[in-house]
C-alpha cells in the first residue's frame, strides 16, 4: 500500500470511531496520524518526499477539524483550520472541502460568542456555493444565529432561512440535517407559538429516534427541557399554570442516565440542563468547568449567570462576586459591549454586600 492509501485507511478508521462515539480512541489515533505526518513541525513537513498527495492531506485536516468540533475542542479545531489554509491552494479555498472548513470556522465563531463574525462568514459562503448540503447547513446556522428570544423582529427572517435549509436537507434526504433543522425551527417558533414550537422539537426527536442517532435524540430532549424553562420564566407572573412544563422538564432530566452518555460534550450539556431544572449548582459547576476549558464563552456566560442568580437567592454574595468575575471574563472574550456593561453594573451593585 502507498502512503496515501494507508492514510485514507486511518482517516476512515477515525471516522468510524467518531460515529461510534468512541472519542478517546478516535483522538488517540488522530494524535498518532498528526505526529506521523509531521504536522507539529511544518519546516520538516514535505508532502511529496513522503509520498502523500495534497488532496489526502486536505481531507485529513478537514476531518480533523470536524472531529474536534464535535468535542468542542476549539484550539484543535482552529489548529486544523490554520493548517488547512496553509496547505490549500487558492483555487481550492472555495471548493467543496474548503467551504466545509469555512463552515467549521463559522461554527467556532458561534460557540465563542462572535456572532457578527459568524454571520459575515456565512453570508459570504452563501454566495459561493450551490452544493445543497452546504446550503442546508449555512441556512440552518444563519437561522439559529438570529436569537429569537432577544430579537423578536428577526423571527420571520429566521423561518425563511430555516425553511430553505429544510428544503435542501429534504432534497438530499439527509435525515440528520432534517432533524437538526426541525429542532432549530422549533426553537424559533416557541417564543411566539409555544405549542407549534414544541411539536417541531418533538418531530426532531422522533426523526432522530428512527434514525438511531442517540446524540441527536439527547439534543432534542435537552432542547425541550430548555423550552420548558423559558416558558416557565416567560409566564411566571401571569397567573398561568406552569406545572405541565415543570413536570416535563423534570421528567426528561431524570429519565437520562448521565453514566450512559457517550461523550464529555453530551455530559456537559446534560449537566447544564440538570442544573437549571433542578437548581443543582454542582451540575452547573461541572458544565461551567467543561465549557471554560473548551473556550465556549457564550455557554460560560449563560451558565455563570444561572449560578449567580442561585447565589443571589441564597444571599451568598461572596459567590455572586466571584461568579460575576467569570461572567465579565467571558463577556470580554466575546467582545460583547452590552454584556460587559451589564456585568459591570452588577459588580457595582454587589460590591459592598
Regions flagged by a language model, labelled:
Residues 4, 55, 96, 133, ...:
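Residue signature of alpha-solenoid helical repeat architecture, marking inter-repeat boundaries
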Residues 31-45, 81-90, 123-131, 162-174, ...:
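Amphipathic alpha-helical segments of tetratricopeptide repeats
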Residues 1-34, 55:
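N-terminal leader/linker segments that initiate helical-solenoid repeat arrays
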Residues 127-202, 206-208, 213-214, 219:
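Solenoidal tandem-repeat scaffolds enriched in leucines and small polar residues
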Residues 1-12, 16, 286-353:
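C-terminal non-catalytic interaction modules
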Residues 8, 52-55, 59, 96-100, ...:
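Residue register of alpha-helical TPR repeats
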Residues 15-28, 65-77, 106-118, 144-159, ...:
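Short coil/turn connectors between adjacent alpha-helices in alpha-solenoid helical repeat scaffolds
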